[in-house]
Amino acid sequence: MSLLTEVETYVLSIVPSGPLKAEIAQRLEDVFAGKNTDLEALMEWLKTRPILSPLTKGILGFVFTLTVPSERGLQRRRFVQNALNGNGDPNNMDRAVKLYRKLKREITFHGAKEIALSYSAGALASCMGLIYNRMGAVTTEVAFGLVCATCEQIADSQHRSHRQMVTTTNPLIRHENRMVLASTTAKAMEQMAGSSEQAAEAMEVASQARQMVQAMRTIGTHPSSSAGLKDDLLENLQAYQKRMGVQMQRFK
């Protein structure tokens, strides 16, 4: 796996699924391929994106700044600086300085990532802030190692929280989660269906599913009534794709 592929993988792992994620993935691909060279426009676009947490925006801004060639005097962006200040916690800053001293002696991506993984996400973000604010300089490879370690820490905690929700025995939470998943699957089906004639059936199924979820929420239903809703939708989607000649093995 190439270095940039690895960076893209880690960064996208902390971006919530949805149309915005696909957009960010495209921007990252363009940046890494050298197709997007307007850093200022890129940062302005990033700053105004909804849904993303300030820290995710900060990390993406850091990656764009590392990758896109820019004039030396180009102003640093406040939204990135604020996100990478370790919540203003002096402990994070102390640890970030110690980490920076270690990283300065490192030259490889994997070496830097290994060192950084033993620090908390707050300290890692602060260390990125030091480098972003030009208070310290490391090689691009080392900076990318720091980025990937930070994303791994964040993705780990997101995964723990997601697993807690998936394995919860609370029927109300499970019911709501199934309805949310069915609704987002229906939305994805509508987007994929496009405007071809064969799409009418898929659109109809998706529309009915969304109406059903809406009705279930409006009148309040038994927690078990949502069981299998998303799986039924996915079966319909795969049947539609087969007719269209698309073979997608797994959507679940």
Curated annotation (Swiss-Prot):
Keyword RNA-binding: yes
Record's keyword terms, sorted: Host nucleus, Membrane, RNA-binding, Viral matrix protein, Virion
Keyword Calcium: no
SMART domains per UniProt: Flu_M1_C
InterPro entries: Flu_matrix_M1, Flu_matrix_M1_C, Flu_matrix_M1_N, Flu_matrix_M1_N_sub1, Flu_matrix_M1_N_sub2, INFV_M1
Matching SUPFAM superfamilies: Influenza virus matrix protein M1 (SSF48145)
Pfam families, A to Z: Flu_M1, Flu_M1_C
Subcellular location: Virion membrane; Host nucleus
Cysteines engaged in disulfide bonds, as pairs: none
Location of region: Membrane-binding: 1-164
Gene Ontology BP term (one): viral budding from plasma membrane
GO molecular function: RNA binding; structural constituent of virion
Motif Nuclear localization signal boundaries: 101-105
GO cellular component terms, A-Z: host cell nucleus; membrane; virion membrane
Membrane topology: Peripheral membrane protein
Residue ranges crossing the lipid bilayer per the database entry: none
Region (RNP-binding) residue spans: 165-252
Membership in a protein family: Belongs to the influenza viruses Matrix protein M1 family.
Miscellaneous comment in the UniProt entry for this protein: Most abundant protein in virion. When expressed alone can form virus-like particles in transfected cells.
Self-association state and partner proteins as the record states: Homodimer and homomultimer. Interacts with NEP. Binds ribonucleocapsid by both interacting with genomic RNA and NP protein. May interact with HA and NA. Cannot bind NP without genomic RNA.
Function as written in the Swiss-Prot or TrEMBL entry: Plays critical roles in virus replication, from virus entry and uncoating to assembly and budding of the virus particle. M1 binding to ribonucleocapsids (RNPs) in nucleus seems to inhibit viral transcription. Interaction of viral NEP with M1-RNP is thought to promote nuclear export of the complex, which is targeted to the virion assembly site at the apical plasma membrane in polarized epithelial cells. Interactions with NA and HA may bring M1, a non-raft-associated protein, into lipid rafts. Forms a continuous shell on the inner side of the lipid bilayer in virion, where it binds the RNP.
The name this protein goes by in its record: Matrix protein 1
Organism of this sequence: Influenza A virus (strain A/USA:Huston/AA/1945 H1N1)
Gene name of this polypeptide: M
